[in-house]
Amino acid sequence: MKLKILMDNHTEIDVYYLGEPAVSYWIETEEKAFLFDAGYSDAFLKNAEGMGIDVTQAEAVLLSHSHNDHTGGLKPLLALDFLKKPQFIAHPDALLPHDWNGMEIGSPVSKEELSEKFDLHLTKEPVWLTEKLVWLGEIPHTLDFEPAYAIGTVEKDGEKREDYISDDTALAYVGEKGLSIITGCSHAGICNIIAYAKKLTGVEKIQSVLGGFHLFHVDERAKATISFLKEENIPELYPCHCTSFAVRAALHGECPVKEVAVGTELEWK
């Protein structure tokens, strides 16, 4: 499986793509191609064009969660002409209104708009995209140091309630050397995600983890996360997006952290 980073907070020197505080990945397997998250704007589409990637070839568009740094680019994506009607796979809560301090932070496009271009598959359950690649669905909180926490509110069944971001999910690829896990923001907790991916696939060895860890301070939660990741003995860690420099530096003191940016290509067999 090959993965190309279409959007991240960071760009590389002498590699002239656009960056923004957002995430988008292009994934190719032997059988199919997938778009995982759509950044904050149309910048991921401009980067894809510069990389020679035609996103209209996607078998499915996958969402990690609702927040607009992952869904903001859906509006320009809808303006494209797809050769066939791709699937759109997301948690049912991902397309609900999400608010933070009076500001809408959810998807800028509705379920009805998306259904015009995509075959919507809204589910809490895991979806096997290929024999080796799975969209994990709703992540259970099983680790005491990674409890659910609220960010703003979500409007559901006609009422606003605290948003515990239950729509947050990730991908797992079953490779020859173990699992490779790809996250958006890891609001569910990167360690909860790893634990669930292992349980779901039956694979104990983690080969790599890529994505946002949603850790900004080297606090008790971050320290417990670092201890967990060290215990897992993961050869390749690619924390990016919503992982601060301080946390990445602390993690690098204990684990093999590798740098990624817009345009980085990774491959797992």
Please identify what each model-predicted range represents:
Residues 102-104, 125-176:
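Active-site-proximal loop/helix segment associated with metal-binding centers of metalloenzymes
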Residues 67-71, 76, 164-170, 174-261:
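Cap/insert and terminal regions of metallo-dependent hydrolase folds
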Residues 2-51, 164-183:
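Conserved beta-strand hairpin/beta-sheet module of binuclear metal-dependent hydrolase folds
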